[in-house]
Amino acid sequence: MGQAAWGRDVAVSNDIVALRRLINLPADVTSAQWQTGPLAPHGGDWWLAAVMDVPADRLPALLADPAAPGTLTTPPGMVANASFAALKSVPGARPIAGDRLSVPGPLHGIEPFARSPLLQGHALQMSATRLFVVLWTM
């Protein structure tokens, strides 16, 4: 378990059943690790980040088109351990603002995964079979 911002613990989970209760999780996802946390020390806004494994032939169907070049900033308190550590290896990724990462690349929408209240976010293809998705409320 990692220590998140504002003294909260962040655990990485691989419970797909629990993840399905929070977001739309396509049947093509074979495994996932995920974590959640607050966006600020006060208020009710929060985020969910997930690294998902998908068969290579099914991954393109999960990427909302079109991709736009951009930079994804990991949410405050997200712990870059377990499968999340692979974000550090994305070309151009760099640490910013303490525990956060800035990760450049083609960013996709999160329409295939969005479920109220998690309606904002980005998806980033990490490899031929791996996808990083971050969603947040607001």
Annotated model-derived regions:
Residues I23-P26, A97-P117:
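Short, solvent-exposed secondary-structure boundary motifs
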Residues M1-A27:
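N-terminal low-complexity, Pro/Thr/Ser-rich intrinsically disordered segments
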Residues A114-A128, V134-L135:
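Short, exposed beta-strand-loop hairpins at the edges of beta-sheets
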Residues R8, M52, R130-M138:
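Short, extreme N-terminal segment that most often corresponds to the first beta-strand
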Residues A4, G44-D45, V134:
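Short, low-complexity intrinsically disordered segments
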Residues M1, P69-T74, S127-W136:
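Short N-terminal helix-initiation segments at or just after the protein's N-terminus
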Residues V17-R21, Q33-A40, L119-Q120:
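Short secondary-structure capping micro-motifs at structural edges
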Residues P26-S102:
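Mature extracytoplasmic domains of secretory-pathway proteins
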